[in-house]
């Protein structure tokens, strides 16, 4: 049977391609988090740890943030695998609870790390990160509410939005390294302070762009040749960014 008999098949196939690419990149990212910060927690080489002597609150929240970053990266991919949802629904429910609680705790600890402990990027970048966090909190609550009400179609939509928002930090790194691969130089930003028009734009695009593409997918019900082409192009761009991030950012820090 040809694709005309199944108008949604090209988009479904393209979406599946993007998911496979993203799942691979997220697995690499999760491995990086586990190895890099696990080594630091066990007393690895100086300079790898972001802990500050005597800052028990900051260090504790940093630990919470990193642990949930690792868990959310791994669990998020598992939650989107259809056979797992169908064959082991109890596991899907329990992992979903961990994911939503982790998203909330990771976001709240992130607010502290950005606004109290401090990080690079300046006010614009911090505001974008905080807006991303507010989206995460809202999507987590809405996904939980719909699941409790057994409105599973709506729950799935909010859970997908939550997945995109939670992975904003990953999208940022992939987008940044794709940009650097294209220009072969830090065009549009200062790499020392992480300020400048490009990183400001990317700070918002890291969650707004994935959410926009997801909304197009949900509202068109997976139909449309242009959407399929867009998803294939995004898959290629994502693969390029993953390669750049792996070779230029993650791998050098763990070997």
Regions found by a protein language model. Give the residues of each.
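Alpha-helical membrane insertion/targeting regions
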Residues: 2-255
């Amino acid at each position: 049977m040809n694709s005309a008999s199944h108008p949604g098949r090209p988009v479904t196939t393209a979406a599946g391609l993007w998911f496979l690419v993203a799942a691979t990149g997220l697995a690499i990212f999760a491995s990086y988090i586990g190895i890099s910060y696990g080594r630091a927690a066990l007393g690895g080489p100086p300079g790898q740890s972001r802990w500050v002597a005597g800052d028990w609150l900051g260090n504790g929240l940093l630990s919470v943030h990193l642990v949930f970053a690792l868990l959310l990266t791994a669990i998020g991919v598992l939650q989107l695998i259809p056979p797992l949802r169908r064959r082991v629904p109890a596991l899907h429910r329990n992992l979903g609870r961990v994911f939503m609680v982790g998203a909330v705790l990771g976001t709240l600890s992130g607010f502290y790390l950005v606004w109290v402990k401090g990080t690079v990027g300046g006010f614009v970048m911090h505001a974008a990160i905080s807006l991303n966090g507010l989206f995460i909190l809202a999507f987590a609550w809405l996904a939980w509410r719909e699941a409790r009400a057994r409105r599973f179609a709506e729950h799935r939509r909010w859970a997908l939005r939550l997945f995109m928002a939670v992975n904003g930090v990953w999208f940022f790194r992939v987008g940044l390294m794709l940009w650097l691969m294209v220009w072969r130089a830090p065009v549009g930003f200062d790499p020392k302070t992480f300020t400048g028009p490009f990183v400001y734009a990317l700070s918002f695009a890291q969650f707004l762009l994935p959410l926009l593409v997801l909304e197009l997918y949900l509202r068109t019900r997976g139909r449309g040749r242009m959407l399929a082409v867009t998803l294939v192009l995004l898959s290629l761009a994502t693969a390029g960014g993953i390669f750049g991030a792996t070779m230029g950012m993650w791998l050098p820090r763990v070997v």
